[in-house]
């Protein structure tokens, strides 16, 4: 990234390696400053191809504590989730009323659900994705999930993430 500073000085930020120094990242500061620290005049982006296979998992838990304790286990695993969200029951219920979509189960085996994790996994093939989904299911069930529900179609994934995306609107009402 090339930036012109308020003094007129031209500076180049970024590197071809993932870690070049400790301390503050001038690159991230510049991006986050929205033009107040300098003007970006040149930017190089690395574009990666879209995944060939994607699915989301809805994982109900009896309580928020167990759901939250599962997040680091997912992040430290080899699954490399594209997204992880945790949600409490009350906001999910309000969101589903707001969107008119009923995606998240309210009880499992007669037990009320207290919290949810919603994750998205992607892969270069359906077979590889299926393996990742099995690994994720095993990990979260061992961690205390009540069940694992697969949103494997674009419509199911859209409904699950639309409920999550509506949280801010629901809170503002």
Where in this protein do the model-derived segments appear?
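Noncatalytic alpha-helical scaffold of FAD-dependent oxidoreductases
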Residues: 1-173
